[in-house]
Amino acid sequence: ITRRLSKRADQLSIQAKTLSQQNVIASKLSNLSLQLYSHLLQNGYVKNNEELEFINKYFYNKLPKYEFDSFGFREKLWLYKSHLWFSFLCQDIVNSYKYARKWVDLFKENKKYITLHPVFYLKGINYLLEASFFVQKRSIFKRELASFEEEIEQKIIPLNTNTELLIFEYLYANKLHLHFL
């Protein structure tokens, strides 16, 4: 009995250390994402090479070292969000699309998180549509917008005051974007 408890204590200690490391990575990525978003709000998009160099250095200096294979849902989400904001800041719309796509696919591969974090899911869909619009990919945009409408009709996204407002805003803004594609 004593050996079993000792082994169990060791297992719990290892699990606690792993969880702690995941929390540190998630926190660093979350902070990086928020700092990039804040920079975008305060300064706008990169306008010249000097600003591009600053953002590149800032991003890569703040991006923590990680092993992607050890990531769970949360760490992947914050990684994709960080790369998305970095790409948007640099006006790299192709990479913005790439990371918005990864963000949305992460939710679609882990459907329970759509219910747990519907606002993040909706924001990911909106960024995916926005990036599709900017790269002028009409067929992709139409497909993603139709998929969004289908999810709304099938009530896949939980409804509350916040999600209803976001759905309304994102759906009709993107229907307007479709008109201009």
Where would I find each of the regions flagged by the language model?
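Flexible helix-coil transition and linker loops at the boundaries of alpha-helical arrays
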Residues: 19-26, 62-73, 107-118, 152-164
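Detector for Asparagine
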Residues: 23, 31, 43, 48-49, ...
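Helix-turn-helix repeat elements of alpha-solenoid scaffolds
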Residues: 3-14, 44-63, 90-107, 135-155, ...
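Alpha-solenoid helical-repeat scaffolds
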Residues: 6, 49, 53, 70-74, ...
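C-terminal intrinsically disordered extensions
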Residues: 56-86
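Tandem amphipathic alpha-helical repeat scaffolds
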Residues: 2-3, 31-48, 77-92, 122-135, ...
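N-terminal capping/interface segment
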Residues: 76, 101-103, 120, 128, ...
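Flexible inter-repeat linkers and adjacent short helices
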Residues: 1-54, 69-70
